[in-house]
Amino acid sequence: MTIVGISHGYPPLWNMGGEVSLHRTLASLKEEVVVLTSTEKDYSFEGVKVKQVNTPNVLNINSSPGPIAEQLKQLNARVVIGQSELSLPAVLAARAAGAISIINVHAPPKYGRSIRQAVIQADYAIYNTEASAKEWGEPNAIVLHPPISKIPNSISTNGDAYTVLSSLLNKGINVVIELAKRYPNKRFIVVRSPAEPTHGLADLEEIASEIPNLELHPRVPPEEVYKYFEQTRILLVPSRYETYGMSAIEAAGYGIPCVHVDTPHVREGIGEAAVLVSPSVEETARGIELIESNYQAYSEAARARAEWLQDRQSQELEKFEDFIANVQRPTNRSLRQTSVTKATRKTG
């Protein structure tokens, strides 16, 4: 029997937080794992087999589940874990193939309207934070905080840059641009996002060319992000919203402090080991000044938090593995359907 993940994209080609989190979760399982996704050819990545999903449009949540169900039957799927745009097709295909369906939920209902029907109809949902589980109406559901990469053996705080790991508008690129103008003697690194053409600034390169201390750098695979962390003094995450904040935790492993937008979900991750702010220029600047006023203390707090989170992660992955190994089809799916429906009625 096989565990099958279904996602619109998958590492190493798709390296956004949701895809990376799904991969690290699936890679932790001892059973055979296959992922169906958008890919030109089949491949294997860190022990996970990856195949082309049989659907013409991986970004269409209303894609026909029939062809996917046939794939699941061929793979002898026991459990199907779907997320994002392919969440509903994954649930319906799993049902047709006689497999158990699980939705990997990494956003609160406000930002997850498109997957609402999938969450309602699935056999189970797994949430990325306790706050998210409560907002979806399942406070007792399984919570698996997004796994981070192994933290380094020692800290590295010799960098000089204020770094933001995304160039998108919703990640606060405008805030960072204004900060670079405010601190002309400080180095700023902006790591570009592949979604920049649709969700970024059309004239970012022109803007950066007029700000000498603002550097644009290419996106790298998760295993190479250390190249930027080694150059970073403070990580900046002035996003409009964050549903967890993996990058801050990854940076914390290096002893790099962070100025981070404050949300209930972020508090379950980096939490108060970062300076939590509203996503504005003034608040982010205040956060920078606070860290610089006592850098060593903030660095040590960041590293300590990363170590604690890594221990929690090990425990959660063990529980998740045990759950997958023993999961059975629910005897009464309607109980969670009713709970999720009521909790998310206003966002549906």
Predicted regions and their residues:
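Conserved acidic donor-binding segment of nucleotide-sugar-dependent glycosyltransferases
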Residues: 274-282, 289-295
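Conserved catalytic-core segment of nucleotide-activated headgroup transferases in glycan assembly
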Residues: 150, 156-206
